[in-house]
């Protein structure tokens, strides 16, 4: 079977004006663009790894329109990912793997998508990228923030150009930024909810700033310039349990503003949900080693699900499809800055 990947040296006709839902017809599938610039080492940008997260694509379109009649400051390679899911406005289609879980290092079984991501990494390895930025949206109430997979001064400097809020994580495996961390400083940038012009503008300005960098500093980031957090667990809801928000008649009825807890340091005893007729903890929390650690972070008390210890959530969402396809969210703790 042939590769899913298309490559193009240049900007396909109509790309800069196309809507995300039009890209499957316009491009024919996932596409890697290579554009020349004054500095040869390319900035790599990935977009639409989730088909309903459109800010990355819109930021790239705006950026390239800005440079339509002038030379890019640096070469640029752009990966446009799950265009089939984008046609339907979905994170991924039924039967598709998650495009941000199948990069080298993944736990997922072999698939055409997994082979494609390995191909993208190998192509870019030969081009020696300057830096890598994967642009995402999320569905809950979150600030704009940057994620890194290595505690490294260059990674942190690049991330701090986007936000003072930085998150270090090594799970889930198979994400784009972790695969590219072996090649160059690599980030995931989270730009808030889809459809917010501030997120698109922030992403475009950041990508433009990256194109103008001649080098990335390798000295320590000043402690007063960043807040660094560490993802300590991914939280899932087992399929055996029904769930809802507010006053739903379900097994787990979360508070209706659960997503407003994101990036807030919650004290022990914070109530998250009412539990109906369940004795065991109804959440799974998986730590960096892959161990189930829900009892470390949660307890049931008077039919209420509460935090056992101080913790900070991120990406808690009210979107039931996202929760089933991915997770409820993440738990974080503060992380010391390296010397």
Question: Which residue ranges define each predicted feature?
Answer:
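Structured catalytic-domain cores with a bias toward divalent-metal coordination
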Residues: 1-339
């Amino acid at each position: 079977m042939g590769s899913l990947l298309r490559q193009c040296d240049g900007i396909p006709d109509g790309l800069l004006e196309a809507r995300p839902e039009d890209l499957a017809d316009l491009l024919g599938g996932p596409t890697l663009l290579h554009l020349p610039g004054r500095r040869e080492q390319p900035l790599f940008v990935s977009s639409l790894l989730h088909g309903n997260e459109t800010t990355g694509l819109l930021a790239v379109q705006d950026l390239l329109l800005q440079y339509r009649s002038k030379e890019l400051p640096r070469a640029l390679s752009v990966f446009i990912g799950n265009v089939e899911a984008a046609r339907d406005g979905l994170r991924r289609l039924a039967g598709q793997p998650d495009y941000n879980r199948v990069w080298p290092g993944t736990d997922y079984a072999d698939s055409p998508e997994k082979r494609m991501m390995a191909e993208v990494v190998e192509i870019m390895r030969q081009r020696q990228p300057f830096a890598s930025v994967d642009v995402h949206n999320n569905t809950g109430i979150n600030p704009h923030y940057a994620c890194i997979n290595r505690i490294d001064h260059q990674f942190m400097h690049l991330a701090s150009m986007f936000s003072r809020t930085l998150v270090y994580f090594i799970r889930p495996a198979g994400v784009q930024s972790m695969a590219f961390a072996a090649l160059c400083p690599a980030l995931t940038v989270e730009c808030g909810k889809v459809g917010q012009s501030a997120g698109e503008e922030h992403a475009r300005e950041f990508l433009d700033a990256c194109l103008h960098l001649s080098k990335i500093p390798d000295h320590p980031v000043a402690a007063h310039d960043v807040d660094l957090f560490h993802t300590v667990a991914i939280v899932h809801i087992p399929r055996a349990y029904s769930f809802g928000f507010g006053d739903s008649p379900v097994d787990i009825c979360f508070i209706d503003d659960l997503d407003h807890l994101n990036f807030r340091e919650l004290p022990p005893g914070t109530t998250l949900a009412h539990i109906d007729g369940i004795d065991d903890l109804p959440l799974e929390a998986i730590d960096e080693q892959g161990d189930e650690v829900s009892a470390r972070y949660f307890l049931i008390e008077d039919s209420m699900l509460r935090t056992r210890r101080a913790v900070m959530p991120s990406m808690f969402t009210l979107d039931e499809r996202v929760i089933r396809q991915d997770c409820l969210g993440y738990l974080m703790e503060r992380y010391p800055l390296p010397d």
